[in-house]
Amino acid sequence: MAEEKGGKQVLEESAFEEMERDFQGVLHELSGDKSLEKFRIEYERLHAVMKKSYDNEKRLMAKCRELNAEIVVNSAKVATALKLSQDDQTTIASLKKEIEKAWKMVDSAYDKEQKAKETILALKEEIVNLTKLVEQGSGLSMDQHSNIRDLLRFKEEVTKERDQLLSEVVKLRESLAQTTEQQQETERSKEEAEHAISQFQQEIQQRQNEASREFRKKEKLEKELKQIQADMDSRQTEIKALQQYVQKSKEELQKLEQQLKEQKILNERAAKELEQFQMRNAKLQQENEQHSLVCEQLSQENQQKALELKAKEEEVHQMRLDIGKLNKIREQIHKKLHHTEDQKAEVEQHKETLKNQIVGLEREVEASKKQAELDRKAMDELLRERDILNKNMLKAVNATQKQTDLVKLHEQAKRNLEGEIQNYKDEAQKQRKIIFHLEKERDRYINQASDLTQKVLMNMEDIKVRETQIFDYRKKIAESEIKLKQQQNLYEAVRSDRNLYSKNLVEAQDEITDMKRKLKIMIHQVDELKEDISAKESALVKLHLEQQRIEKEKETLKAELQKLRQQALETKHFIEKQEAEERKLLRIIAEADGERLRQKKELDQVISERDILGSQLVRRNDELALLYEKIKIQQSVLNKGESQYNQRLEDMRILRLEIKKLRREKGILARSMANVEELRQEFFHMQRELLKERTRCRALEEELENPLNVHRWRKLEASDPNAYELIQKIHTLQKRLISKTEEVVEKELLLQEKEKLYMELKHVLARQPGPEAAEQLKLYRRTLHDKKQQLKVLSSELNMYEVQSKEYKYEVEKLTNELQNLKKKYLAQKRKEQLQKNKDTAPMDNTFLMVKPNGPGFTGGGFPLRSTKMTF
C-alpha cells in the first residue's frame, strides 16, 4: 500500500512538474504579446494560487499519513489492551472458581466444626457422668473401662481431626489471601488497561479533531480557490467585453475607412491620417479605460493606505502629543534653569556694576583730590602772579586794565572752582554713604549668591536627572521619529505613485483632448480640402507630393503586411500549441476518470470493511459490558464471602475459648480426684492402652508405607463417611482439573486462531486505503473541475484567436485590393498628367509664374492654410 501511495505521489509530482513546464512555456509565449499582458498576469496569479493549494494539499496529505500511522499504532495498543483485559477476565474467572472451591471447603470445614462441637458436647456429658460415678465411688466395670478407652480413643481421633481441620483452615486462609491478592492485582491491571484504553481513545479523539480541523482548513482553501476561479471568470467576461468593444471600434473604423475610400484620390492622405488618428484614439481610449481601472484600483489602494496612514498618523499624533508633553516638561525645566541662570547672571552683573561703580567713584575721588591739588597750585601761582602784577602795575599802565580784567576772571574762576570743590566734597560725602550702603548690599548679595549657588547645585542635580530622562525620551522620540520617517517614506512613495498615476491620467486626458482638437482641425482641413478641390492650379504640386507619399505608404503597407503575416504565423503556432495542450488535457481527464472509478471501488470496499469492523466493535463492547456486570456480581459475592469468613473466624475464636475453658475444668477435675489408687490403676491401664495404640499406629504406619490394599479407602464408606466424601471430592477435583486443563489448551488454540485472524484483518486494513483515498478523490475532482474551466477558457481564447485571424486575413485582402486600386488610380492619374503636360506646357508655366506669388501657403503635407481663388 505504501509503495502504491509512493508511486501515486511520484506520478502526481511528475504531472505537476509537467504542468509547471507547460505553464512556463505558455508564459514565455505570452510575454512577447502586450495585448495579452492582463491575461498573463491573471494566469500567473491563478498558477500561484494552484501552487499554493498544491503545497497545502501535500502538507495536509503528509499530516493525514502521520495521523493514520498514529491511529494504526493506537489501534494496535487498544487491541493489546483488549487482549490483556480478556486475559484478565480469564484469570478472574479462574480465581472465582478457586474462590468457590475455597468456600465449599470452608463450608465443609464448618460442617466438620459443627460435628466436632456436637461430639465435644457429648464428651462433656459423658465426662460429667463419669465424674458423678467417680464421686459416688463405685468401681468401674470392664464395660465401663472399655467405654472409657473407646471414648479416649474417640477423643484422640477428634483432636486429630480438629488439628487437620485447623491446618486446612490455615491453608484455606492462605489460599484465600493469595486469591484476593491475585484478584486485586488483576483489578489493578484491569484498571490500568482501562485507563490506557481511555487515554488511547482520547488520543484518537484528538487526532480525529485535528483531522477534522485540517479538513475544515482544506474546505476553506477550496472555497477560496472557487472564489478565485469566480473572480477569474468575471475577469474573463470583462476581457471578452473589452474585446467586443475593441471589435466594435474596429468595425466602426472599417466603416470610416470605407467612407474615406469613397473620397477622391487627392483626399486619401488626409483620410488615411484621419484613420491613423482614429486608431490611435481608440488605443488611447482603451488605454484610458485601462488607466481608469488602474486609477480605481489605485484609489482603492489609496483609500486603504489612507486608512492605514490615518491610523499611523493617529499613532504619530499620539506620540507627538507625548513628545509635546515631554517637550513642555523639558521647556519648563529649561525655563527654570534659564531663570535661575539669568538671576545668577543678573546678580553677578549687578555685583560687577557695583564693583565698577565703586572703582569709578574711587577714581573720581582721587581725580577730585588731584584737581584740588592742582587748583591749590593754580591759586598759589595766581597769588604769585597777582603779587607780580601788583609789583608791575606801576610799570605798565596800559596793561593794568587788562590785568585787572584777568584778575576778575581768575577770581571768578576761583569762586567757581571753590564752588566746584565744595560740590565735589558734598558729592564725595554722598559717594561714601553710597559706598557704605553698597558694601552692605554687597554682603547681602554675597549671602544671596551663596544661597543661590546651593539652589543652583540642587537644580543642577535635578537637571542631570531630568537630562537622563530627556535622553531616554530622546531615544524614544528618535525611535518614534524613525518609525514616523518610515511611515512618511511609505506615504511619500504612495503619494508619488498617486501623483505619477494622476499625472499619467492628466497627460492621457490632455493627449485625448489634443487628439480631439487635432481631429477637429483635420476635419476642418478636410472641409477646406473639399472647398479647394476646384483649385486646379495646385494639382501638379499636390500630385507630385502625393506620388512621394504614396510610395512611402506603399512601403509602410508592405511592412504592415509582412507584420500581419508574421502575426498570422504566430497565431497559427499558438493555435497548434493550444490544440496539443487540449489533447494533453483530454488525456489527463481520461486518466483522472479512470483513477476516480478505481478510487470509488476502493472506497466502497473500505466502507463495507468499515461496517464489518463497526459491527465487530459493537459486539466486543457488548461482551465487555457483560464482563463488567459479571465482575460486579463476583465482587459482591467476594464481599459477602469475606464477611462470612470473618464470621467463621469469630466462631473459631469462640471455640478456642471454650476449649481453654474445658481444659481448665479438666485440670480442676484432675486436682479434685481424691482416689489416687484408682487413678494409678487407670494410669496403668492407660499406659497399656497407649502401648497397644502405639503398636497399632506402628502397624498402620507400616501398612501405609507398604500398602497391601490400594482401594482400602473404600472401607471408609461405612466407618468414616466424611473421609470417604473428602477422598471422592479430591478425585472429582482431580478429574475437573484435568478437564479444565484440556479446556485451557482448547482456549489457547482458539486464542491463537483469533490472533491469526486479527493479524490477517490488520494486514487487510493496512492494505485498504484510508482517508487519503477520499482526499485524493476530492483532489482529482477539483483538478478535473479546474481543467474543465481551463479548457473552456482555452476554447474561448481559441475562438477569439480564430476570429482575430479571420479579421487579419480580411484586412490583408482589403489592403491588397486597396493597393491594387491605388496603383490603377496612380497610373491613370499619371497618364492624365502626362497628357496635360503635353497639351498645356507653355500656358501652364505662365500661369504658374502668375499664380505663385498670390497662391495659398502650404505646410507639412500640402494642406492650405487659407483658401484663394486662382484665375488662369
Curated annotation (Swiss-Prot):
Swiss-Prot/TrEMBL keywords: Cell projection, Cilium, Cilium biogenesis/degradation, Coiled coil, Cytoplasm, Cytoskeleton, Disease variant, Flagellum
Variant or mutagenesis effect after changing residue 628 to C: In SPGF49; uncertain significance
Function recorded in the entry: Has an essential role in the assembly and organization of the sperm flagellar axoneme. Required for the elongation of the primary cilium and sperm flagellar midpiece via modulation of the Notch signaling pathway.
Family of the protein in this entry: Belongs to the CFAP58 family.
InterPro entries: CFAP58_CC
Signal peptide positions (record): none
Primary residence: other
GO biological process, one term: flagellated sperm motility
Top-rank lineage group of the source organism: Eukaryota
Entry GO CC: centrosome; cytoplasm; cytoskeleton; extracellular space; sperm flagellum; sperm midpiece
Name by which UniProt lists this protein: Cilia- and flagella-associated protein 58
Lineage of producing organism: Eukaryota, Metazoa, Chordata, Craniata, Vertebrata
Effect of residue 108 to L: In SPGF49; uncertain significance
Disease: Spermatogenic failure 49: An autosomal recessive infertility disorder characterized by asthenoteratozoospermia and multiple morphologic abnormalities of the sperm flagella, primarily coiled and short flagella, with markedly reduced or absent motility.
